[in-house]
From Swiss-Prot:
Subunit structure: Heterotetramer of two alpha-D chains and two beta chains.
Record protein name field: Hemoglobin subunit alpha-D
Originating organism: Aythya fuligula
GO molecular function annotation: haptoglobin binding; heme binding; iron ion binding; organic acid binding; oxygen binding; oxygen carrier activity; peroxidase activity
Alphabetic keyword roster: Heme, Iron, Metal-binding, Oxygen transport, Transport
Annotated residues for binding of heme b: H58, H87
Function: Involved in oxygen transport from the lung to the various peripheral tissues.
Amino acid sequence: MLTAEDKKLITQLWEKVAGHQDDFGNEALQRMFVTYPQTKTYFPHFDLHPGSEQVRGHGKKVAAALGNAVKSLDNISQALSELSNLHAYNLRVDPVNFKLLAQCFQVVLAAHLGKDYTPDMHAAFDKFLSAVAAVLAEKYR
């Protein structure tokens, strides 16, 4: 459960990310593919090389979904319902991969924001990404 303070920090963080979210989404995916190569199996039709337009496009979608969730912090489940259906019923992505991507997104934020990514902000965004991962996995049950 996100507290009022968590929500405030998440919103502040996303304001810092504004203008870079597509690049951060792309970088998080690239990092995931390198760090967890087994995740590539879900993208057999993608060119997964660095700089790939397909990965960049998917990174943009990831960032847009996170932005949508940030705008709907009081109802993340409703905001991501269609995405949850897509990943559970059509794509059949193993839910552990949502956590792997979340971890990679955290690393990208820390690398780019440095001291502006405070420990409190990190903790709040970690809770947020855990909530997003849980919502994306809820249709699997």
